[in-house]
């Protein structure tokens, strides 16, 4: 009986997702961040005149540019 309970406990621990990972918007859909990536970002860049491009996704640290948005909750960078 003890072996059965121990086996059940081990299987339960292995099957649980013990780590939390952040989910951020990216250009097309959602991205599950790596465990060390604690922030979502959105930043508009202008690669060509009059053609803005918004970059979105996970990041390790917040961008310092004035046109960047940084946040730390799921799907917050929309």
Swiss-Prot record:
Q: What is its main location?
A: secreted
- Pfam families referenced in this protein's UniProt entry, alphabetically: Toxin_cobra-type (PF21947)
Pinpoint the site Important residue for inhibition of muscle alpha-1-beta-1-delta-epsilon (CHRNA1-CHRNB1-CHRND-CHRNE) and neuronal alpha-3-beta-2/CHRNA3-CHRNB2 nAChR. 51, 66
Q: Which Gene3D superfamilies match?
A: CD59
Localization per record: Secreted
Q: Which GO terms describe its cellular component?
A: extracellular region
Please explain the role this protein plays, according to its UniProt record.
Answer: This three-finger toxin binds and inhibits the nicotinic acetylcholine receptor (nAChR).
Protein name as catalogued: Short neurotoxin OH-26
Organism, by scientific name, is Ophiophagus hannah (King cobra)
* Source species taxonomy: Eukaryota, Metazoa, Chordata, Craniata, Vertebrata
């Amino acid at each position: 009986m003890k072996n059965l309970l121990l086996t059940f406990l081990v299987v339960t621990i292995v099957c649980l997702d013990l780590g939390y990972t952040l989910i951020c918007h990216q250009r097309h859909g959602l991205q599950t961040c790596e465990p060390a990536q604690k922030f979502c970002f959105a930043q508009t860049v202008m690669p060509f005149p009059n053609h803005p491009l918004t970059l979105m996704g996970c990041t390790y640290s917040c961008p310092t540019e004035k046109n960047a948005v940084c946040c730390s909750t799921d799907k917050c960078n929309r």
